[in-house]
Amino acid sequence: MAKLGPGQGLGCEAAVGLLAPSRKREYKACNKLTEGKRPLYAIGFNFLDFHYYEVFATVGGNRVTTYSCLKDGNFAILQAYIDEDKDESFYTLSWACDLDGTPLLVAAGSNGIIRVINCATEKLLKTFVGHGDSINEIRTQALKPSLIISASKDESVRLWNVHTGICILIFAGAGGHRNEVLSVDFHPSDIYRIASCGMDNTVKIWSMKEFWPYVEQSFTWTDLPSKFPTKYVQFPVLVAVVHSNYVDCTRWLGDFILSKSVDNEIVLWEPKTKEQSPGEGSIDILQKYPVPECDIWFIKFSCDFHFNQLAIGNREGKVFVWEVQSSPPVLTARLTNPQCKSAIRQTAVSFDGSTILACSEDGSIWRWDEVDHPKA
């Protein structure tokens, strides 16, 4: 299958953002909390239910913790889950919900085992086994929040139904990734489409359209999950080489894709696929968002619910906030704290962008709140 490089599009020059903060939005450092000495690899707000917009979770070591962001700038610990295996190291989390709306928290990491926690009963609900190696990222389908997708070191991506415990699809094989899959994301409106990226330096776009009957079947399956006719999706609809090194984070922005590697920038690009000719198409590089000292892998960015603000940390403990949809890109703020010197592994931006959280290599959570943010 042909791999598409940046030259195979319109050839227009990409708009590059300037690193001078516009001060359109000002944030103040207002809190720090240290969970322990083990690195925190993931942090995320719950955008699935407006009752829980102030709730976020972190993972690090064999612990999953949920918090509430209080209006006075403090944190309140809500729940903590300690995995039975003390050697587990969680790398990723995602919020999901059961068919009745019960909030679920899904976490996975070095053991390659997915844990589904019921936040209402505060108990482990389900455990999914299937991946042959560690899991680097889990994402939830916002249009059907009982569907999750996992990206693994075993070079595969898997689609799961958290309600029935079924592994529905495995994206791997002849056209699959050739090294660890580091990040994955569902398209925000095209329910059939996902994007994945990894250590083979590629971003792959996949379609579930012809396999969708199996997705529907997974909701009504009454036999053992192990007896479900799990299907392989072997060929993506597009393979793009936008970066020359590991690609460790990718997110859809409408029909465009944001992705980053270890070369101090995030790239916004447009994939143009041909439905009738899988594997063929073109890509156009649209914009670049510089991020200084962001040259190590497993640093992930995040956005607010409406994809207005994007926040990303670097290896020196600084956070850069970009106005995603401006052209050229506008740097909203550069967030620092004299005590924050460890690598920021992931950020979390609140629903309206008024609070930005970051989790770091030294086990700390950092919080910045917007100054004079208009309250609803």
From Swiss-Prot:
Job description of the protein: Polycomb group (PcG) protein. PcG proteins act by forming multiprotein complexes, which are required to maintain the transcriptionally repressive state of homeotic genes throughout development. PcG proteins are not required to initiate repression, but to maintain it during later stages of development. They act via the methylation of histones, rendering chromatin heritably changed in its expressibility. Involved in the regulation of seed endosperm development, grain filling and seed dormancy.
GO biological process per UniProt: cell differentiation; endosperm development; heterochromatin formation; maintenance of seed dormancy; negative regulation of transcription by RNA polymerase II; post-embryonic plant organ development
Other comments on record: Plants silencing FIE2 have small and partially filled seeds, and exhibit seed germination before seed maturation. Plant silencing FIE2 exhibit aberrant pleiotropic phenotypes in vegetative and reproductive organ generation, and derepression of some developmental regulators, such as MADS3 and OSH5 genes.
PROSITE patterns, A to Z: WD_REPEATS_1, WD_REPEATS_2, WD_REPEATS_REGION
UniProt keywords, alphabetically: Chromatin regulator, Developmental protein, Differentiation, Repeat, Transcription, Transcription regulation, WD repeat
Mapped WD repeat ranges: 85-127, 130-170, 176-216, 242-279, 291-332, 339-376
GO CC, one annotated term: PcG protein complex
Nucleotide-binding in keyword set: no
Family membership noted in the UniProt record: Belongs to the WD repeat ESC family.
Pfam families in alphabetical order: WD40
Reported tissue expression: Widely expressed.
Subunit-structure text: Interacts with EZ1. Component of the polycomb repressive complex 2 (PRC2), composed of the core PRC2 components EMF2B, EZ1 and CLF. PRC2 methylates 'Lys-27' residues of histone H3 (H3K27me3), leading to transcriptional repression of the affected target gene.
Name under which the protein is recorded: Polycomb group protein FIE1
